[in-house]
Design a protein with these regions (language model features):
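N-terminal auxiliary segments of SAM/dcSAM-dependent transferases
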Residues: 1-22
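S-adenosylmethionine/decaboxylated-SAM
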Residues: 42-167
């Protein structure tokens, strides 16, 4: 199956540009590219904001912090009382994300940045306590992340697997 059959470049461009990202989300994506960190597309960040808003998400788990672009997009849609728990083994990326959150005046009680192997860390999170789980991590571990997400999500919660069709 050819890529053109799935979505031509004009359609993809239109979809990506239809809803512009807020400046701070765009800046975090640019920081990711500069740092050599995989950066989410505008379409991904817009979809995350939409999902968090529709769910009125108060508790979100993000597996794969990156430079904070996806976290910022989630905060755009989350409840003002919401808490983002973001897990990543790369402390440096988390420091960049933390600064991005602070630059947006997101109070520290609204985010938890946990450094460590995600599959080990999620074992310590509460069952059925989260509205949304975003997995943006090592693709070869997605099967295990899905199993953990099933445990973490409340009834009606949403699992997002970024780049699930990557291969």
């Amino acid at each position: 199956m050819s890529e053109a059959f799935l979505l031509d470049k004009r359609s993809l461009g239109y979809a990506e540009d239809y809803v512009p990202a807020p400046d701070h989300v765009r800046a975090a994506r640019e920081d990711a590219v500069s740092a050599g960190v995989p950066a989410p597309s505008n379409g991904v960040t817009t979809a995350l904001t939409f999902l968090a808003k529709v769910l009125d998400a108060k508790a979100v788990v993000e597996i794969g912090t990156g430079t904070g672009a996806t976290g910022l997009a989630l905060f755009e849609g989350m409840s003002p009382q919401g808490v983002l728990t973001s897990i990543d083994p790369e402390v440096g990326w988390q420091l960049t994300a933390k600064q991005a959150f602070r630059d947006r005046q997101i109070a520290s009680q609204h985010f938890r940045l946990i450094a460590g192997r995600p599959l080990e860390v999620v074992n310590n999170l509460r069952d059925a306590a989260y509205d949304l789980v975003l997995v943006n991590a090592e693709k070869l571990e997605y099967v295990e992340h899905v199993a953990q997400a099933e445990r973490l999500l409340r009834p009606g919660g949403v699992l997002v697997l970024n780049d699930a069709l990557w291969h």
